UniProtKB/Swiss-Prot annotation:
Organism this protein belongs to: Polynucleobacter necessarius subsp. necessarius (strain STIR1)
Reactions the enzyme catalyzes: 3-methyl-2-oxobutanoate + acetyl-CoA + H2O = (2S)-2-isopropylmalate + CoA + H(+)
Binding-site residues, Mn(2+): D14, H202, H204, N239
Subcellular compartments: Cytoplasm
GO cellular component: cytosol
Organism phylogeny: Bacteria, Pseudomonadati, Pseudomonadota, Betaproteobacteria, Burkholderiales
Pathway assignment: Amino-acid biosynthesis; L-leucine biosynthesis; L-leucine from 3-methyl-2-oxobutanoate: step 1/4
Name of the protein this chain belongs to: 2-isopropylmalate synthase
Catalytic EC class: transferase
Function: Catalyzes the condensation of the acetyl group of acetyl-CoA with 3-methyl-2-oxobutanoate (2-ketoisovalerate) to form 3-carboxy-3-hydroxy-4-methylpentanoate (2-isopropylmalate).
HAMAP family documented for this protein: LeuA_type1
Gene for this chain: leuA
């Protein structure tokens, strides 16, 4: 019988550490619900001690999720661990994930603690955590660069104190597959009580080997939990990509002889949702979830596919959630057809009032473009959910004028608090003019780090999805806006980013590197 691999998703915590990928409480809940539909075993919802916003988001996820374990990260101290436990009160399936650095470099430079002090703190923190929850994970931060003898002592000690999962991260993405697998194997062999805990791997992608290292940790090392994120989202070069792990285990079951409980048909919906919320576009050639992942342009390849799909495809697009439904909705489509498509996309609308709002937005978009695709519907639902969050800034309308040889002018009407404001400005282009009009009133003083446009579907009728990244006071936020009018989408994206800057609960604790 095949071994079970636990899928631990940290999109909402480690994935959110990507510059600009900060998510609101409601956005985290929406992603968590999709992760639950994906049948993820453990959802790491955040770092409770890092901010009041993260604490509230973890609490909301804990209340919303019913079928997955909900986890909070914590540094290995009583204050952080208590905060994590408090945030998880709404769920009976909770995990506290405590971490402490164990490499010589981190202990000396960052912690300024001796190895013996680190060992005692690790033991003390796990002992304390076990009084607050029964499911405790310990991460040896920068574990792969730790000295083997010392790491064995720490791991043995925390298992004795009650840790049920031991995570050995490659925090800086330094490992290579065979060496990492052997490292985990050696640890499990040398730690006397290694059979009392589940061993976990957490790899970063700095050298492009996060997925390979994680799989080696399982195949060679004997780990049975993989920590990963949707789309490989994460700081620096990212984390292990969940979709690649799941489909590797599934497609090469003959080699790995392991299974996971993931519903693979929910992979693409999860990928699209995370991309839309964070504003991080999935590269077209990204494995499994990229737009070109199942595209064949070579004539020889196309001929082979037409004769037998197995000639050039090792998995089917529909297996990972690419829609095979060719029925396109339009302005004549009714409410039932719209509701049915939502169900097919795995989108749950609990209240009739929310469905009515979404359907109204659908009809408004259908008046602007003749065909509504799945990607359009996902964007509609994202906009509807954002509107429910009680934004401080809210787009109302826009008009602009431009002629060759003249500076474009734009007039933007938006709501700021309880006031409706119209503002005019000029700029180097219609987008610049529109954002200048908003900034002239908002006076945020934020630095614009990124402006990007992505067509949601193909063709000139496609909605534009605009991402604006702003920085202020050490915080970096992304705003996303969609509209068939690129100028309007740009204004919406800018206002979306301003909303995140305006919310003080979203300010993060800039404490230290995490696993």
């Amino acid at each position: 019988m095949s071994d079970k691999v636990i899928i631990f998703d940290t999109t909402l915590r480690d994935g959110e550490q990507s510059p600009g990928a900060s998510m609101t409480k409601d956005e985290k809940v929406r992603i968590a619900r999709q992760l639950e539909r994906l049948k993820v075993d453990v959802i790491e919802a955040g770092f409770a001690a890092s901010s009041e916003g993260d604490f509230q988001a973890i609490s909301a996820v804990a209340a919303a999720v019913k079928d997955s374990i909900v986890c909070s990260l914590a540094r290995a101290n009583d204050k952080d661990i208590t905060r994590a436990a408090d945030a998880l009160q709404a769920t009976n399936a909770k995990r506290i994930h405590a971490f402490l650095a164990t490499s010589p470099l981190h202990m000396a430079v960052k912690l300024r603690m001796s190895p013996e002090e680190v060992l005692e703190q690790a033991k003390r923190s796990i002992r304390f955590a076990c009084n607050l929850a029964s499911d405790i994970e310990f991460s040896a931060e920068d574990g792969y660069r730790s000295e083997m003898d010392f790491l064995c002592r720490v791991v043995e000690a925390v298992i004795n104190e009650g840790a049920s999962t031991i995570n050995i991260p490659d925090t800086v993405g330094y490992a290579t597959p065979e060496l990492y697998g052997e490292f985990i194997k050696t640890l499990r062999t040398r730690v006397p009580n290694s059979d009392k805990a589940v061993w976990s791997v957490h790899c970063h992608n700095d050298l492009g080997m996060a997925v390979a290292n994680s799989l080696a940790g399982v195949k060679i090392g004997g780990a049975r939990q993989i920590e990963c994120t949707i789309n490989g989202l994460g700081e620096r070069a990212g984390n292990t990509a969940l979709e690649e792990i799941v489909m590797s285990l599934r497609t090469r079951k003959d080699y790995f002889d392991m299974v996971c409980g993931i519903d693979a048909t929910q992979i693409v919906p999860a990928s699209k949702l995370v991309s839309q919320i964070t504003g991080f576009i999935v590269q077209p050639n990204k494995a499994v979830v990229g737009a070109n992942a199942f595209a064949h342009t070579s004539g020889i390849h196309q001929d082979g596919i037409l004769k037998n799909r197995d000639t050039y495809e090792i998995m089917r697009a529909e297996d990972v959630g690419w829609s095979a439904n060719k029925i396109v909705l339009g302005k004549l489509s009714g409410r039932n057809a719209f509701k049915q498509r939502l169900q097919e996309l795995g989108i749950t609308v609990e209240a009739e009032a929310d469905l009515n709002v979404a359907f109204t937005r659908f009809k408004a978009l259908a008046d602007q473009k003749s065909e509504i695709f799945d990607e359009d519907i996902i964007a509609i639902m994202s906009d509807s959910a954002a509107a429910e969050e009680g934004e401080h800034y809210k787009f109302i309308s826009l008009s602009q004028h431009s002629e060759t040889g003249e500076r474009p002018k734009s007039r933007v009407t938006f709501r700021m608090g309880d006031r409706e404001i119209s503002s005019e400005a000029e700029g180097n282009g219609p987008v610049d003019a529109s954002l200048n009009a908003i900034e002239g009133i908002a006076k945020s003083g934020a630095e614009q780090l990124l402006y990007s446009v992505n067509a949601i579907t193909s063709g000139t009728q496609s909605q534009g999805e605009v991402t604006v990244r702003l920085a202020k006071g050490g915080r970096i936020v992304n705003g996303v806006g969609t509209d068939p009018d690129i100028i309007a989408a740009s204004a919406k994206a800018y206002l979306s980013a301003l909303n995140k800057l305006h919310d003080p609960s979203q300010a993060k604790l800039n404490a230290q590197m995490t696993p």
